[in-house]
Amino acid sequence: MPTVISPTVAPRTGAEPRSPGPVPHPAQGKTTEAGGGHPSGIYSAIISRNFPIIGVKEKTFEQLRRKCLEKKVLYLDPEFPPDETSLFYSQKFPIQFVWKRPPEICENPRFIIGGANRTDICQGDLGDCWFLAAIACLTLNERLLFRVIPHDQSFTENYAGIFHFQFWRYGDWVDVVIDDCLPTYNNQLVFTKSNHRNEFWSALLEKAYAKLHGSYEALKGGNTTEAMEDFTGGVTEFFEIKDAPSDMYKIMRKAIERGSLMGCSIDDGTNMTYGTSPSGLNMGELIARMVRNMDNSLLRDSDLDPRGSDDRPSRTIVPVQYETRMACGLVKGHAYSVTGLEEALFKGEKVKLVRLRNPWGQVEWNGSWSDGWKDWSFVDKDEKARLQHQVTEDGEFWMSYDDFVYHFTKLEICNLTADALESDKLQTWTVSVNEGRWVRGCSAGGCRNFPDTFWTNPQYRLKLLEEDDDPEDSEVICSFLVALMQKNRRKDRKLGANLFTIGFAIYEVPKEMHGNKQHLQKDFFLYNASKARSKTYINMREVSQRFRLPPSEYVIVPSTYEPHQEGEFILRVFSEKRNLSEEAENTISVDRPVKKKKNKPIIFVSDRANSNKELGVDQEAEEGKDKAGPEKRGETPQPRPGHTDQESEEQQQFRNIFRQIAGDDMEICADELKNVLNTVVNKHKDLKTQGFTLESCRSMIALMDTDGSGRLNLQEFHHLWKKIKAWQKIFKHYDTDHSGTINSYEMRNAVNDAGFHLNSQLYDIITMRYADKHMNIDFDSFICCFVRLEGMFRAFNAFDKDGDGIIKLNVLEWLQLTMYA
C-alpha cells in the first residue's frame, strides 16, 4: 500500500476541502502504434534532435490490418515481440512459455462472447489484481468499455492476428496495437483469462496494457486508481474508510449512478501496493509456484480435449498468495471491485448492501449476505431476484455495508466528471492541463520542509475569476480540484524507477504581483503560509484534492517530498467557473539591449561578430556603473568621480601585459588566452579553481570575436576581462561555503544578478549542461555559461533585423552560428 507522509509545514488556512468528484469524458485523442509517447513539449527541440530517425510514418490499426490482409499474413508486433523480453525484465527463467494465437489454443476462438462482463476476468499469476479489478468496474459501463475496446475486431471477419485498445495517457488518448500471440504453458493461458476458454478480450486487453508499460512484469503490483484513470481519463478520490464522511454510502451510490468506477482493499500493514509479493518471494519462485498450480490443474483435466471445447469454462487457478486470506474469506492486500449497491428488505428492515468482486474469479466473503448465507431463506423471492442471488463460485458476492466498513480500509473512486458526489447537481467544469518536470539540481526542490530549494520547484499561476453559482452558499467562493500525476514511473521500473512521494501547496499571490507571471522567490515562501495544500504527501501516481477559496490569483507548487528527485508530471485543474492556469515564467531578456545594424546581409561568422563591435560602446557604459551590480533597464550609467585617471592607468598596465603575451599583432589565440586568464585567476586562491580549460577559452574567443579572425584583440579581451571580473563577484557572493563551487539551485539567482532573465526550461538546461554529478558548478563552468549567454544574446540580436524577437536562418547561417560558439 502507498506510504503517506505528512510534512511539517505552516498550517493551512481557509475552509476544509470537500471530497473531490469525477472528470469530463475526454475527446478523441491521437492514435499511435507505439505504446509509449513522444517527448514532452518542455524540451522537444533538444530531445527531438537526438530522437531515433523514423523511416516511415507510424501506421494506424486500419492501415496495418489492411496490409496484412492484402499480403495474407498474420501481424507480428515488432515493438512487443512474443518472447521473454516482453514478459520479464528482472531475470530470465528456465521455464519455457509457448506463445500461441487463440486459434492455436482452442477451437472457434471468440473475441467477446455474449457481451463483455465482469465474469470474463479471471486473474492469472501476475500480481495485477489492481488492473483486473478496474476492468471489472469498466464492464459495468458499456459506453466506457467500448471506448477502451473498439468494436471493429474479431477472429472471423477481417482477422489478421492484429488487435487494438485505447487508453488515456497523460492527457491524450492513445491507440495501442498488438498481435494476438499470448504466453501459454501446457496450452493454458499464463496470465489473465476468461471464464470461457474460447473468449480472449480480457487476455488481449491485458497484453495491450503490458505493452503500454513495457512488459508484463511492469504490471506486478499497483493501485486500482491507475488503471481506472487510464480507462477513463477521470480523476480519483481516495478515502480512508475509518475517516470517511458519515454519508459515505450516499457518496458510493451516486458514484454508481454516475458511472464512476470504484475499488476497495484491506490494508495488510506491509505498505505494499495491491498484488506485490513479499520481499522473500522473487520472480523465479513466483513462476515456479504458478507452474505447479497449472500442472496440478492439468492432472485434473487430463481426460479432456487439450485444445478445449467452445463452451467449457476455463480452469481458474487462485494466484500465488502474495495477499493474506482471512477466516471470513476476504483477502488482505488485495484489490476488489465495487460492482453494485442496493438496499434489501430483511425481516421488516432495510439493510444497506455492497456487491464486490474478487478478480481471482473465486475466494469469496463467507459472512452475512454471502452466496451461501443460511438466512437467504428469510429474504423474499422477488428481493433475491432483484439482487441476482445465486450460489456460484465466480468471485462476486454481497455483504452488508456495516460489514464492508468494518473489514475494508480503503475506497477508491474514479469519477468521470469533476462533480462532487455529495451534490445532486451536475455542473460543466473548466479543465486546464499543464505538463512539467522536476530537474535535479534546478527545479527538483522538494517540499516546504526544504526552504532553500522549495522555491525552485515549477510554479503554476491559477486565476480564479468567478465565484460559484450556489444560492444556498453566502460565501464568495470558487470550487476547484487539483490533480497532480507523475509520469512514466511504472514504465521505467526496469531502469530502477519507483513512484515518488508527491504533493502540492497553494499560495495566494500578492495583489501587486497579479498578472506578472514571475517565478516567486525564496523570501516569498519563507514569510507566507500556504492557503491550501494536499492533505498528505504520498507515493501514488496521482494526488488529487478539492478546495474552496475566494476569487484571487494563486500559485500552485507541485513537488516531491524529498529534493533532488527527477521526473515528469502533469497538473490538472478543474473548476466550476472560468479559470486560467499556466506556468509561471519569466520573459526571456537581457538587461542591456544591444544596438543592431539593419539591412546588412549576414555573411560568415558574423553579423554576430559585427554585433560584437558594439562591445566597445557597452564597455564605456559599463565602466561608469556602480560595483553593486547591473543597472536597471533603461537607465543611463554615469561615470564615478575620479574614475577616469585610475582607469587609464589600469588600462595602460593592461595594455603592457597584453602586448607581452600577444606580440606585435596585438591579438591572442585560445592557448594564449588560457595562459593570461589562468595567470590572473590563480592569484585568487579563494576561487579554488584549477583554471580555464583550452576548450573554454576557445568558446570565449568564438563568442567575443568581433571580426571573425578566431583571435581576440586588446579591446575584445578587455571587454571579456571586465565581464569576468563582474561575474567573479557574483560567483563569490553565492559561494557561501567558500568551496570554489556554487549550488546549482542558486544558479537561477546568479543568472538574474548578471542581467540575464530566462525561463524555467532554460534554467533546467543550464543545470544539465554545466553542473557536476553533485549538482555543483565550479568557476570555470560558471564563467563559460555566462560567456555563452552573453554571446548568444548578442548573436540573436545581430540576426533579429526587425527587432521582433524572431529570427530566420538558412542551414548555412545556422551551422556557422552553432559551430563557431
From Swiss-Prot:
Residues at the catalytic site: C129, H334, N358
Protein origin, superkingdom: Eukaryota
Activity regulation comment: Activated by micromolar concentrations of calcium and inhibited by calpastatin.
Positions of the UniProt region annotated as Linker: 587-649
Region (Disordered): 1-37, 603-651
Residue segments, region Domain IV: 650-820
Residues binding Ca(2+) 4: D800, D802, D804, I806
EC number(s) reported in the record: 3.4.22.54
Reactions catalysed, as given in the entry: Broad endopeptidase activity
Cellular component terms per the entry's GO annotation: cytoplasm; cytosol; myofibril; nucleolus; nucleus; plasma membrane; protein-containing complex; T-tubule
Signal peptide: none
Binding residues for Ca(2+) 3: D735, D737, S739, T741, E746
Domain EF-hand: from-to ranges: 649-683, 692-725, 722-757, 787-821
Enzyme class, first EC level, given as a word: hydrolase
Compositionally biased residues, Basic and acidic residues: 622-635
Residue stretches making up the Calpain catalytic domain: 74-417
InterPro entries: C2_III (IPR033883), Calpain_cysteine_protease (IPR022684), Calpain_domain_III (IPR022682), Calpain_III (IPR022683), Calpain_III_sf (IPR036213), CAPN3/13-like_C_EFh (IPR054069), CAPN3_PEF (IPR029531), EF-hand-dom_pair (IPR011992)
UniProt keyword terms in alphabetical order: Calcium, Cytoplasm, Hydrolase, Metal-binding, Nucleus, Protease, Repeat, Thiol protease
Family: Belongs to the peptidase C2 family.
Subunit structure: Homodimer; via EF-hand domain 4. Interacts with TTN/titin. Interacts with CMYA5; this interaction, which results in CMYA5 proteolysis, may protect CAPN3 from autolysis. Interacts with SIMC1. Interacts with UTP25; the interaction is required for CAPN3 translocation to the nucleolus.
PANTHER family referenced in this protein's UniProt entry, alphabetically: CALPAIN, CALPAIN-3
Record function comment: Calcium-regulated non-lysosomal thiol-protease. Proteolytically cleaves CTBP1 at 'His-410'. Mediates, with UTP25, the proteasome-independent degradation of p53/TP53.
Name of the molecule in the record: Calpain-3
Organism: Mus musculus
